[in-house]
């Protein structure tokens, strides 16, 4: 056995302790200024310090898992109650507002009506299943081909549409003849509430939809997504909003607006008021009217929750229409950007947009809304005076090499200016990097967790012409940790038929992979490209290699 093989076989993936607090303390020791983006004393490193552990499950000023879950559900139910009040009493207009709600609503209806014209022939074209958990399938069994192959769930109101769309797919019909149990649908009362981690104080609530409801909802979502692109709102590209946020932080021309529980604040009355009647009726038919919360069924006053297949596109369209109608009303022609509930509009009309949003039942999050100053935030991008100050987060304990290498790369990639990493973070990077085997250094991808990005080891190209090595086409050389994935190669006849139906919908190879706990060391070779360098590394014999 070679020395190299022995070295790899003896590699210990796990660390002896969680290093998260050590990273935090090192950053806190060099942080100065205020972490409040609204403050004149704001500094990026103080912002990083206070954000670093906000998503860690055990550290920081957080709550336990049960409390986070209960707070998330309580927040969802509170939003549902607000929607119920709007459904009963209507929208509450502030008499001091500088616009007429009837005029604004007429403009909004016109914008949405024109955007969605000809919808009746488009809604079934892009229906498909997601790979998420549903009321009929747990997450580990939620591959789309399994939903096609097995008996699907549906609400009573959506049953007619589900039968109609299934009968238009010939592979699905043939499958049902061979496997009769998949021909009929299983009726369920509604969706089911679950929570996912958001930060260490509160979880995020969402819902698992019945299978066929989700299938139909995604058809609507895909249609709205394509139509929004015709007016400059591309829901497949977050970088548009990110660039606009950078522009706003640089010259103050654009404001970024954040809403609290945005999608859960879309009331039934709001959708009824904005959408064409026939389209509203169809969306109302395929949504879940009831939900299971902690084993009890409740009625949804909000129109759709996160987890519904059209919620993201519907809220994007609604916010686009509100902002655009406000622009028209006040004769503003500036740039707008919408990505879900990430709203960007010209600074001069931002107060009017906030008024309109509040009128329709939305709650602006003023802590994360920026209409003045030099800070802007949108779609995960954070800019101060045009410079990227996005913090990184420790979302789980740093207890193995993968999590350690990821945080080392985050440290190197934070606060980079002209290719130079922040020198204040070098000490913690250098100290923790000693725990990683040296053959895992030399990578170039700062988003990776399978090697450490560092000034690369060069591999020269031998030239037969002059008999020496040249570095004109240098590549990095080293190793990386690779997770072992096992691919399912054999499928039952039923699931193989489901794979064909899934292929008929989306094309491409339909596979099913499972991750195992095993890892192995693999050689890596990447084209040399610039990586951020700490000033302390810019001297003779200073490279960690």
Curated annotation (Swiss-Prot):
BP GO annotations: viral RNA genome replication
GO molecular function, one term: nucleotide binding
Pfam family, one: RNA_replicase_B
Signal peptide: none
Catalytic activity, EC: 2.7.7.48
Entry keyword set: Nucleotide-binding, Nucleotidyltransferase, RNA-directed RNA polymerase, Transferase, Viral RNA replication
Keyword Isomerase: no
UniProt-listed PROSITE patterns: RDRP_PHAGE
Complex and partners: Part of the viral RNA-dependent RNA polymerase complex, the other subunits are probably the host ribosomal protein S1, EF-Tu and EF-Ts.
Stated role: This is the catalytic subunit of the viral RNA-dependent RNA polymerase complex. This complex is involved in viral RNA replication that produces (+)-stranded genomes via a complementary, (-)-stranded intermediate.
The name this protein goes by in its record: RNA-directed RNA polymerase beta chain
Organism of this sequence: Enterobacteria phage fr (Bacteriophage fr)
